Amino acid sequence: MAAPRAVLHLGAREWNGRARRIHGMSELVTPDSSREKKRTLLQFLSDHFQDIQTLREYLLQKQISKVNRENRSFTNIQEKYGPYVAGAVFILKQGGAVKFQDKEEWIRPNNRSHFLAEIQKFQNVPVEAVDASGCAINYQGLSNLLPLKELRSLSLQRCPNLDDWCLSRLYLLAGSLQELSLAGCPRISERGLACLHHLQNLRRLDISDLPAVSHPGLTQILVEEMLPHCEVLGADWAQNLKLEPDKQPPDTSTPLSS
C-alpha cells in the first residue's frame, strides 16, 4: 500500500507544480493580452465611429442633392407653356395640388397624367390656389411659384425646408395673395414672420404650431398689428399670458365677507 501512496503523493506534487507554472504564465501573459485587446477595441471603435460619421455626411449630402433636384426651375416648360403650367407641374411633382382659375376641381398628383395630356388648355389660365402642404419646397423652389401673379391662396404648412429666407421672397405675391398657411413649419421664426408686412392684401394667415417661435402669443399680437385687415390664426395668446393661480388678482366682483 506504500507504493500507491507514494505514486499519488508524487502525482499531486507534479500537478501542483504544473498548476503553479501555468498560473505564473497566466500572470505574465494576461496584462499584455488585456492591453492588446483594449487597444484593438479602441481602434475598432475609433474606425467604426469614423465610418459612421462618413456615412452620415454622405447620406446628408445625398439628401441635400435630392432636395435641390426636386426644387430646380422648370425653365424649358416655362418657355414652352408659360409660368402657370410650369408652376403647376412643379407643385404636382412635389406631391401637392393646384387649382386653376374658374375651375371647380383641384388637380392632384393622382390625375397628373390627365392634366399633362391637356396641358395646352391651361397655358393662359392663371393658377389661383396652391396646396403644397408637406412638400420639400426650399428657397430655390419658390422661384417656380413667384411668377403666379394671380395666386390668391397658398398653403405651405408642414414644409420642412421652408425658412425665414423663403418668407422674404413672398412680397412678390403681395398684389394677389389673400390666404397663407405656414402652420407647422419647423424652421420659421419671428424674423421670417416680420417679412410678411408686405402682404397687406392678406385676409387669413395661419401661423400656428411654429416651434422656432419663442413667444407665440406675443408674436401673434405683433403680426395682428402688422396686418390689421387679416385674420391671424395661431397660439391662444390669452392662455399663454394667463397668470398662475397663486398670482391671480383677487376677485372684486363679489362682496367680501365680514
Curated annotation (Swiss-Prot):
Keyword Ribosomal protein: no
SUPFAM superfamilies in the cross-refs: RNI-like (SSF52047)
Sorted UniProt keywords: Mitochondrion
Key word rRNA-binding present: no
A single GO cellular-component term on record: mitochondrion
Compartment(s): Mitochondrion
InterPro entries: LRR_dom_sf (IPR032675)
GO biological process: mitochondrial respiratory chain complex I assembly
Functional note: Required for the assembly of the mitochondrial NADH:ubiquinone oxidoreductase complex (complex I). Involved in the assembly of the distal region of complex I.
Family stated for the protein in its record: Belongs to the ATP synthase subunit s family.
Assembly behavior: Interacts with incompletely assembled mitochondrial NADH:ubiquinone oxidoreductase complex (complex I).
Protein name: Distal membrane-arm assembly complex protein 2
The species this protein was found in: Mus musculus
Gene: Dmac2
